[in-house]
């Protein structure tokens, strides 16, 4: 509920400053200052107060719009578009409340559902989190979006892979994209959004989706031990709204001149 109180499910992004720079080498840089804030808070309600009742309702507090002093993110972004189709992002993210605990901090993109073949160099093959990752070794793995889904009785976040060096998502013909970060990052690719999984009380209630959701995160909050009574994750295993810098590059793969991944160095060939 604290995430709904801050409107994190419904962030709207507004560029308050923008510049376009064309470089002689053919690169194009786009710089933005982006403010991300929800219109208002919301409240998640369940029938009879039971979270497993089968019916969830999200009540938006439209009568209490957010203002300047309510929670928001501000990010300074530099996007560089290269002649080969690669897109690089350098981002510095701050929030109005550095102490707020977040589910994750990073970026999400939607890709066509036909892009369902995964390869990654990180912790796997079982999904893992900050406080439950050392049992999964860092190797190169192949998977599919369908295999990343875990049939929990109550749908929830899943499929996270910590300390990822690079990850690719493609169609069965091998055409798609590869994401490489400056530092190891958390990666997931699922056929359902976080909101879909929050609202669905059982797997059969998940709506069909024609897109896959790919997350690239600087930090993901760990799981803790609430299910067994030990409490939430420790502070160092939580994602906070504190100032964060992250950068990654998205490169095309499968097309002529696209990127290939070196199995020797486990890094993309630049």
Please place each PLM-identified region on the residue numbering.
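Beta-strand/loop-rich accessory regions of lumenal/periplasmic or secreted enzymes
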Residues: 1-270
């Amino acid at each position: 509920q604290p995430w709904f109180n801050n409107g994190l499910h419904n962030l709207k992004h507004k560029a308050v400053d923008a510049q376009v720079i064309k470089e002689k080498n053919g690169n194009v840089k786009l710089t933005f200052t982006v403010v991300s804030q929800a219109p208002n808070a919301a409240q998640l309600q369940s029938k009879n107060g039971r979270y497993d009742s089968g019916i969830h309702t999200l009540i938006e507090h439209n009568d209490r719009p957010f203002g300047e002093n309510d929670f928001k993110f501000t990010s300074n972004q530099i996007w560089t578009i290269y002649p080969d189709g690669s897109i690089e992002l350098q981002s510095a993210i701050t929030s109005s409340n550095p102490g707020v605990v977040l589910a994750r901090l990073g970026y999400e993109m939607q890709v066509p559902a036909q892009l369902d073949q995964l390869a990654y160099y990180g912790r796997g093959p079982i999904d893992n989190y900050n406080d439950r990752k050392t049992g999964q070794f860092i190797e190169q793995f192949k998977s599919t979006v369908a295999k990343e889904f875990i049939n929990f009785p109550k749908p929830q976040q899943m499929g996270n892979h910590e300390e990822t060096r690079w990850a690719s998502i493609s169609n069965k013909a091998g055409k798609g994209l590869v994401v490489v970060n400056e530092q190891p990052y958390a990666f997931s690719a699922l056929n359902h959004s976080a909101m879909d999984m929050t609202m669905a009380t059982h797997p059969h209630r998940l709506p069909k989706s024609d897109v896959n959701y790919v997350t690239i995160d600087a930090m993901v909050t760990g799981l803790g031990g609430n299910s067994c009574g030990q409490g939430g994750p420790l502070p160092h295993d939580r994602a906070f709204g504190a100032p964060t810098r992250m950068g990654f590059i998205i490169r095309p793969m499968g097309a002529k001149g696209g990127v290939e991944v070196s199995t020797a160095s486990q890094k993309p060939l630049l």
